[in-house]
Amino acid sequence: MISTKELRNKFISYFESKNHSHQPSSSLIPFGDDTLLFTNAGMVQFKDVFLGLEKRDFSRAVTVQKCLRAGGKHNDLDNVGYTARHHTFFEMLGNFSFGDYFKKDAISFAWEFLTKEIKLPVEKLWVTIYATDDEAFDVWHNHIGLPKERIIRIDSNDNFWSMGDTGPCGPCTEIFYDHGEDVAGGLPGTPDEDGDRYIEIWNIVFMQFNRHADGTVTDLPKPSVDTGMGLERIAAVLQDVHSNYDIDLFQALIKKAQEVTNADDINSPSLKVVADHIRSCAFLIADGVLPSNEGRGYVLRRIIRRAIRHGNKLGAKDIFFYKLVAELINQMGEAYPQLIDKRELIEKTLIKEEELFLKTIENGIKIFDTEIVSLKSDIISGEIAFRLYDTYGFPLDLTADMAREKGLKVDEEAFKEQMLKQKQRSKEAGKFNVDYNSIINSQAKSDFRGYSTLIEDAKVLEIYQDGQPVNAIQAGSTAVIVLDRTPFYAESGGQVGDKGVLEGVGVEFIVEDVQKSGEAILHIGKLSKGILNTYDEVTARVNDSVRLATAANHSATHLLHKVLKIILGSHAEQKGSLVDDNKLRFDFTHDKAISRVEIEQIETLVNQQIRANYPVATIETSQEKAKSLGAEALFGEKYGDIVRVISMGDFSIELCGGTHVAYTGDIGLFKIVSESGIASGIRRIEAITANKAIKYTFATENKLAAIKEITKSNDSNLLDKLQSMLEQLKNQEKEIAKLKKDILSGANSDIKESSIDGIKLIIANLEGVDIKTLREKIDDYKSKNDKMVAVLSTINADKVQFVIGVSKSITSLIKAGDIAKEFSGYIDGKGGGRPDMAQGGGNNSTNIDKALSDLENHISINIKK
């Protein structure tokens, strides 16, 4: 029997023998593609190649791609554990042609691999083609020799693939394996096609057309091929089992799950859930995702909590999920070394998340069980589901899972309404970023010269206004300029774009931002004088002070990243950064606030590397060579075959395309100005360098000097002096509070109290108190009187403040808010509140006595009505 490990290696070796370049799996987090939550197919890392936006050094590729389907449109989570072939995480075997071979070779490679390399019986294989794809039929029938009756034409979207509403598209051919007559199910295209007898094992997509916005389709100049074969599916075929969960890899994980949960039934769907979910959770964490309440982090949290619930159901009474990581590494660590490298982070993250959820899961399940007893239908309300989510941390799919086991359903639409209301309550304005790739379709190529120069003579290739190409612009126009060569760095890798100017004869274009679109570098800004035409010659001049300040901050992030790993631990991985000329912002994984001592250690070690004045060296080399040098690749970045390596002595080596100083000493000084948490397990450091750090230090020293002058202290006694002053202030505040209380007690004799129809009426203006004291006095009156109206005011610096209290039992007769509005009219102020409590104030204190007298009459009249 061929193992899953052997099958993975055999696939790669076969296509390498056919001159395919073996490319590593890309991250589960798609780089630069906001349309996808997770990588869900092998072609995702080559999307820009297929679109013509990116070029590679090879025309044939083979990959084993990590894929995840557990969120958004592509979501298999609900079915996992209950079917033979649904998974959250799976591996996709794929071979690709970028304008190289086409249908004949693609089909021939697939057939040879299946029938010669892994020796599947020919008589077990069937194929489908798109209904009108006669070329594919000819290859299958006349070249491969497959009988006509085993080639099925399908006239549906199942055999025609497209990347979207527009763009590359084309027919596909699928290869099916026949499990035999003892398994239910019919051929593709028949009413029984959803059975398990005929299983699709390989899909080969022929990208030969380009679909336009008007719906028309034209031929692509260089047709391409995209194929995919699920590793788990083909392993099940080769190991002669009908369920993916019966293959060697899953059986090892299921047995381990049974061991750590004390489960009785090895065939329990819950064991399959746990075995599946450890793969997706471990790989997501290894790729930089941490549990949170939004986005990818929330999908991870949902999967973890679903696994915990199923483990709880199996009999696990304590944390168990992290115990599967060792077996996962045993099964997949050789193919994916990042599992080994990130083992500590994976296990710690799972332990922390499980401990968090175990605090609420038992109570949540009790609430669920209590609620379903009183149900009058088979529908659990959206309100109940939302309560479980909001109070007990139960994701919707977990509640739906529990409901399905009881033969119930959840009103998901009502749940979504509750979620929408919550989002509206906490809605925050989001930052709007322009996606120039989506509005500017430039085919130009700009040659970036900015690593070695800040000034370059160039030619204007294209001009865009409002996303549309134009031939010329007038002074005052905002536009996007594309040059044939440029020293301007385009925003990338967390570093903002350069600023500067494009100058010509009588022409000046102020560059405010720089972005990329494909291979074009976009200079975004405003023409301040002259007329600029396409093909004009200009001098591109980068603002050197901005560039140098930005470079200092960028180089400092490299030092900071390495120092964080030394001080905090190897888990401190970069999660994001922003570098401009003012500051640097660095986000990283760490599960608690950084102490003042650690801040000092970090600053000290970074500044030691600055003073060491290491040369900042740059080399371009292959990814493999870079890894052998110990270069650190950053999460979320996309790298080509040839990468740029930035080294700072032997201290820091990273892959980076940004701009840097020549020596670490050029950074000058590094100073952290803030440290905070931005999400669960994610911390943020903001820091400054060079002149800004020096100015910040001077400003801080000046403030300290001012404090010493005000407090009449020096360096040796400043802290003691401040502590003494704080103690003195606290004592004085206590004395003031006591004096106010005494004043109020003394004023009680001046407070006018009367009774009208059994309702106590209290009215007074009290001197020397604040509004807080008035509120406390009102609360005291209300606690002692069931039927009472109290109006208390005070005057401070000619400003009137008042508080009105009314017992709740009589608010039908008179309301505090109404009295407040009337009171405000006497004092040129404003006031309002609830029926039982209101307050207000004004600037005119001359009428206070008349106001209180008139209010007494007004209240009496209303009570007697």
UniProtKB/Swiss-Prot annotation:
CDD domains in the record: AlaRS_core
Keyword Cell wall biogenesis/degradation: no
GO molecular function, one term: ATP binding
Catalytic activity: tRNA(Ala) + L-alanine + ATP = L-alanyl-tRNA(Ala) + AMP + diphosphate
Predominant cellular place of this UniProt entry's protein: cytoplasm
Location of this chain's protein in the cell: Cytoplasm
Co-factor binding details: Binds 1 zinc ion per subunit.
Pfam families: DHHA1 (PF02272), tRNA-synt_2c (PF01411), tRNA_SAD (PF07973)
InterPro entries linked: aa-tRNA-synth_II/BPL/LPL, Ala-tRNA-lgiase_IIc, Ala-tRNA-ligase_IIc_anticod-bd, Ala-tRNA-synth_IIc_core, Ala-tRNA-synth_IIc_N, Ala-tRNA_ligase, Ala_tRNA_ligase_euk/bac, DHHA1_dom
GO cellular component terms, semicolon-separated: cytosol
Residues where Zn(2+) binds: 554, 558, 656, 660
Keyword annotations from UniProtKB, A to Z: Aminoacyl-tRNA synthetase, ATP-binding, Cytoplasm, Ligase, Metal-binding, Nucleotide-binding, Protein biosynthesis, RNA-binding, tRNA-binding, Zinc
One GO term of the biological process aspect: negative regulation of DNA-templated transcription
Enzyme Commission code: 6.1.1.7
Required cofactor(s): Zn(2+)
Enzyme class: ligase
NCBIfam families: alaS
UniProt record similarity statement: Belongs to the class-II aminoacyl-tRNA synthetase family.
Free-text comment about domains: Consists of three domains; the N-terminal catalytic domain, the editing domain and the C-terminal C-Ala domain. The editing domain removes incorrectly charged amino acids, while the C-Ala domain, along with tRNA(Ala), serves as a bridge to cooperatively bring together the editing and aminoacylation centers thus stimulating deacylation of misacylated tRNAs.
Known function: Catalyzes the attachment of alanine to tRNA(Ala) in a two-step reaction: alanine is first activated by ATP to form Ala-AMP and then transferred to the acceptor end of tRNA(Ala). Also edits incorrectly charged Ser-tRNA(Ala) and Gly-tRNA(Ala) via its editing domain.
Matches recorded under PANTHER family: ALANINE--TRNA LIGASE, CYTOPLASMIC (PTHR11777:SF9), ALANYL-TRNA SYNTHETASE (PTHR11777)
Protein's recorded name: Alanine--tRNA ligase
Gene: alaS
